[in-house]
Amino acid sequence: MKYYCNPINVNYRYQFNKDLENDKIYINREAADPSMICFKGTYYIFASMNLSVWVSEDLVSWQVYKLPENLPLYGYAPDVRVCGEYVYFCASESGEKCNYYRTKDIINGPYEEIEGTFGFVDPNLFFDEDGKVYFYWGCSDENPIWETELNS
């Protein structure tokens, strides 16, 4: 596995979006808390409070695509992981039950929902080489970082 530290040039601005169903205004930050993966030879960046994913084949030129509406698009600190033929996605919704989603096609979907049982912040899935799956979460000066083994 390789890691890169690269000042990727993507928009970082605030967006104001109106939810037409309940007449509320949402503010979205672009590029905060990024999670980047390489899936099938293409790079993807997911960020907090965002409606989109940035996509690149060379880590230099980036295009932005809107994600499906059923994803937690207003969540914080998205966690995106590749395991086999699937990409797993979730984002923090403290105080609310958080679900994971998986897909074989990030841009077009469909996304299969994996129902969660509790709320968390700053999630992180870990797929171990021995086939076990672990889930880590936590971000607080008052609470520890938590970990549990998941049924795979």
What is the predicted role of each segment?
Residues M1-S152:
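Carbohydrate-active catalytic/glycan-binding domains of CAZyme proteins
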